[in-house]
């Protein structure tokens, strides 16, 4: 028997079947670094229209977690897809390097500044620590396959950036947005510093819930207001609070002007409550026998005075819109030094902003004899006992409620009035302008707009000063007596910035005021405060984007971070940019959800459900992690687990196998010599290229809309359905058995070449390592890297006017599906072994029959059977299978007649008819020794 294997065009490629990504990717990274791939891309894209994705700086502390990976991979997908779309899209990664977490780490190792080290030495240690953290995180980010200017990232602790942060503050001051005030701010007693809103988290806390009676100073005036004379006992206005420790700072009681307030007689006294809350308060304080003596509007009680239960002074009733009927008594204890609403209304009524609490959270001397020096949270019980002793406590119980806590220490924080510097939201219209700017930004998902609008509309002034060691100095001089800013503040700040640009922030602390103030130095003091770390990152649109040469003066197109950044970086950047320039710093803002485990639970080391990106990369490879990120809808929570990553690996194998099939069948194909013109190609091959064209249109639209899970779904559909289960199956016969250089085979290879050229580019932004690997095996002259080019433009399709157009082949796909069902049943019934043992008769109604007949003898190749005939639908025998999909089709199957050709495996009746090749069929004889078969359709 002759060996005809050598006459077949069997697929062959060096592209491995197994990805072995964990082992192979590091070598690719080394090549990318050695070649300076990022630099090559920049050179290739020079002069193109720009797209700038400005990197929100992660904090330089600790190893990267799965959330970091999601963020950096999404950014990389966008930057690479923009490059392929014809943009110059430089990516400059950055790090946030100042602030409390780094101070705490350095304190743990070396002690607080001033203990073992000077403040200057402490700052140097902080700088060293931040630099080591940057290096560690950078290695992991690079390992993810993220391309960027890793050799020249921006660090908020770079001297030039520190100087530019000072300049940004100067611009804001010049535009009139800064003011100083003793104002209640979030204060962490462990940090001993003010906290930004973004540094506050909420946890459940148990607090005493108390109802307290403030006795009226002028009882008769109150009786007159309520038009009553017979009142048994004193009259009191009752407040409810869960922060008894703030009562020493009480300076008023707020009531609502339009609420009805009732005078209620209870045993031995009368109390004033919001009428709608009387019943619930009576239940709470355990009173069943009570009488409502009269009601008045809250406005009637304004400025009536009530005695503080233990502080020895009286306070007014004032009117406030912040009073609600949700809980309590309808009368709100008001301490302007301990709450933003209290402060605002206190300003309106000229109340004292009293703050009896020191930075360590203990009462200052002279507050009250039994409270001086006591921690405020320990003072709650003392205050409750005091109220009980004075007969002012109507009720006390423990209550669990959501309470603000420090993001770093996880401990409860307080509102505390301290002298601080603020960016005003309203004195120069910053709030109104910011709200206007928000409307001009594209928010992705679109609910982000309403979220940030609500935050901007309701946020207080931004406290930007901090009492810390490791941070950018505010660089201000204030008059010793008046505390007014120096009249030449902007000029002086620029002088400081120039010094910081050379020597870093230490230049400010080393600066002798005489050096720049001369004779005025003894009249002014240096402000010791540093800037809120959110000011550092929030000003990078100015300190980084505006000055980096690769951005060429262009503003950022996109900011992309987790959804917590609406109140964080998106907010601080918007505030600073609008205050400086009157406009938003971004054109688009994209947010992604948080990572959760496979059951939707928050990731937690204590639960043990965290997924380490380093482990995933070491086990499965970065491309699997990248594919998981891309295939997950980032607009909601992003679930990740070993099982979910395993599914991503399965999807990866499908894509890799498709790429390998294409490469293996392009063996021996030189596009410069072997390409077949579209008009000379087999129709099915043109259809396949058209499928790629349609897929590319969908994929590019999805990339443009940042719908990466749609990209992956469309890519998978193309690989699995249009290619895997149809086209690639059909062409194997022609590809393997036709003459090597025949039009029939070269047509097929031409289609595969076009498809591979497109596919490798679709993959590149997501499966960057695999795309680079595929690129190296593609035939033909090309640039060294897929990332320097653009989307493939060589695709074409069938015209709608052609008889065998896309609609024709769509119907053929359905016919093929119906035939497969019949074959599968026959195999199950042991009638045939494989599809080539079968011959089918398609009983079709005239319109479908005409289409099937048009393929002639090539119909069998489409159906993967050894025989295929078309007959009239009405002639179908009883055992023909009615199609459920195509009403005008019935399928009958029989065993194929003739012998099996050992070369093509088809059963035919002309096997052995040619003496010289007695074992093979006539078609194979033609392909081996003759002119080769001609294919027109399939």
Swiss-Prot record:
One of its GO terms (biological process) is isoleucyl-tRNA aminoacylation. The keyword Metal-binding applies. Binds 1 zinc ion per subunit. HAMAP family: Ile_tRNA_synth_type1 (MF_02002). Catalyzes the attachment of isoleucine to tRNA(Ile). As IleRS can inadvertently accommodate and process structurally similar amino acids such as valine, to avoid such errors it has two additional distinct tRNA(Ile)-dependent editing activities. One activity is designated as 'pretransfer' editing and involves the hydrolysis of activated Val-AMP. The other activity is designated 'posttransfer' editing and involves deacylation of mischarged Val-tRNA(Ile). PANTHER family: ISOLEUCINE--TRNA LIGASE, MITOCHONDRIAL (PTHR42765:SF1), SOLEUCYL-TRNA SYNTHETASE (PTHR42765). This is Isoleucine--tRNA ligase. It comes from Escherichia coli O139:H28 (strain E24377A / ETEC).
């Amino acid at each position: 028997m002759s060996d005809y294997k050598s006459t077949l065009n069997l697929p062959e490629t060096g592209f491995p079947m197994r990805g072995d990504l964990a082992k192979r990717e590091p070598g690719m990274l080394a090549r990318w670094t050695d070649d300076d791939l990022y630099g090559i891309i920049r050179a290739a894209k020079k002069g193109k229209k720009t797209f700038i994705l400005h990197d929100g700086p992660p904090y330089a502390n600790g190893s990267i977690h799965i959330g970091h990976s999601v963020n950096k991979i999404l950014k990389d997908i966008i930057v690479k897809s923009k490059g392929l779309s014809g943009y110059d899209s430089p990516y400059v990664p950055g790090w946030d390097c100042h602030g409390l977490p780094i101070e705490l780490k350095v304190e743990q190792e070396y002690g607080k500044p001033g203990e073992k080290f000077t403040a200057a030495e402490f700052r140097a240690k902080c700088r060293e620590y931040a630099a080591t953290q940057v290096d560690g995180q950078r290695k992991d980010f690079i390992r993810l396959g993220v391309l960027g200017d890793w050799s020249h990232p921006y660090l908020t602790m770079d001297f030039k950036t520190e100087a530019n942060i000072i300049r940004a503050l100067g611009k804001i001051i010049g535009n009139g947005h800064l003011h100083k005030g003793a104002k209640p701010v979030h204060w962490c007693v462990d940090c001993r510093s003010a906290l930004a809103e973004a540094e506050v988290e909420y946890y459940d806390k148990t607090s005493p819930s108390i109802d307290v009676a403030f006795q009226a100073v002028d009882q008769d005036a109150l009786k007159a207001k309520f038009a009553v004379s017979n009142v048994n006992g004193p009259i009191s206005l009752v407040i409810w609070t869960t922060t008894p420790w703030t009562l020493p700072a009480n300076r008023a009681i707020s009531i609502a002007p339009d609420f009805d307030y009732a005078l209620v007689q209870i045993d031995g006294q009368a109390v004033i409550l919001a009428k709608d809350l009387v019943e619930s308060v009576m239940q709470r304080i355990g009173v069943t026998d009570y009488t409502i003596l009269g009601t008045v509007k809250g406005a009637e009680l304004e400025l009536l005075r009530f005695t503080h239960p233990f502080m020895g002074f009286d306070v007014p009733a004032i009117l406030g819109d912040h009073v609600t009927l949700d809980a309590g008594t309808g009368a709100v204890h008001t301490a302007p030094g301990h709450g933003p609403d209290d402060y605002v209304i206190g300003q309106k009524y000229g109340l004292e902003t009293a703050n009896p609490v020191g930075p360590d959270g203990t009462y200052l001397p002279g507050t009250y004899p039994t409270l001086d020096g006591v921690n405020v949270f320990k003072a709650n019980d003392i205050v409750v006992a005091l109220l009980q002793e004075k007969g002012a406590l109507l009720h006390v119980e423990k209550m669990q409620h959501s309470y603000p806590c420090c993001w770093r220490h996880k401990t409860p924080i307080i509102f505390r009035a301290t002298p601080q510097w603020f960016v005003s939201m309203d004195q120069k219209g910053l709030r109104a302008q910011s709200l206007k700017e928000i409307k001009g930004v594209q928010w992705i998902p679109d609910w982000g707009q309403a979220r940030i609008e609500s935050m901007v509309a309701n946020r207080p002034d931004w406290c930007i000063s901090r009492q810390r060691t490791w941070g950018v100095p505010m660089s201000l001089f204030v008059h010793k007596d008046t505390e007014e800013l120096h009249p030449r503040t902007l000029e002086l700040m620029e002088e400081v910035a120039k010094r910081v640009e050379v020597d870093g922030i230490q230049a400010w602390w080393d600066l002798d005021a005489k050096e720049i103030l001369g004779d005025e130095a003894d009249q002014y003091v240096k402000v010791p405060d540093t800037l809120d770390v959110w000011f550092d990152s929030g000003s990078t649109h100015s300190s980084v984007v505006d000055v980096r040469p690769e951005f060429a003066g262009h503003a950022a197109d996109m900011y992309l971070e987790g959804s917590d950044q609406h109140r964080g970086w998106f907010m601080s950047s918007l505030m600073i940019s609008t205050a400086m320039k009157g406009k938003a710093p971004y054109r688009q803002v994209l947010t992604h959800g948080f990572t959760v485990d496979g059951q939707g639970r928050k990731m937690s080391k204590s639960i043990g459900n965290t997924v380490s990106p380093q482990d995933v990369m070491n086990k499965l490879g970065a491309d699997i992690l990248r594919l998981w990120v891309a295939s997950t809808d980032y607009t909601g929570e992003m679930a990740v687990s070993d099982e979910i990553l395993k599914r991503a690996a399965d999807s990866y194998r499908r894509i890799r196998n498709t790429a390998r099939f294409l490469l293996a069948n392009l063996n021996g194909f030189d596009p410069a010599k072997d390409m077949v013109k579209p008009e000379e190609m087999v129709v099915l091959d043109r259809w396949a290229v058209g499928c790629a064209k349609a897929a590319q249109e969908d994929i590019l639209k999805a990339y443009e809309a940042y719908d990466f899970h749609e990209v992956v779904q469309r890519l998978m559909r193309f690989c699995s359905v249009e290619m895997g289960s149809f086209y690639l199956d059909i062409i194997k016969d022609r590809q393997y058995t036709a003459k090597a250089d025949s039009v029939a085979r070269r047509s097929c290879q031409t289609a595969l070449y076009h498809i591979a050229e497109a596919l490798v580019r679709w993959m590149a932004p997501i499966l960057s390592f695999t795309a680079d690997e595929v690129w190296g095996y593609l035939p033909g002259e090309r640039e060294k890297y897929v990332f320097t080019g653009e989307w493939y433009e060589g695709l074409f399709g069938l015209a709608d006017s052609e008889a065998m157009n896309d609609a024709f082949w769509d119907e053929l796909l359905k016919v093929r599906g119906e035939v497969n069902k019949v074959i599968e049943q026959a195999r199950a019934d042991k009638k045939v072994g494989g599809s080539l043992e079968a011959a089918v008769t398609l009983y079709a109604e005239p319109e479908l029959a005409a289409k099937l007949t048009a393929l002639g003898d090539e119909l069998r190749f489409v159906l993967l059977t050894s025989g295929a005939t078309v007959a009239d639908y009405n002639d179908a025998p009883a055992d023909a299978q009615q199609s459920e999909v195509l009403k005008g089709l019935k399928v009958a199957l029989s065993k194929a007649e003739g012998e099996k050709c050992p070369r093509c495996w088809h059963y035919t009746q002309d096997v052995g008819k040619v003496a010289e090749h007695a074992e093979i069929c006539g078609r194979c004889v033609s392909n081996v020794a003759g002119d080769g078969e001609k294919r027109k359709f399939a």
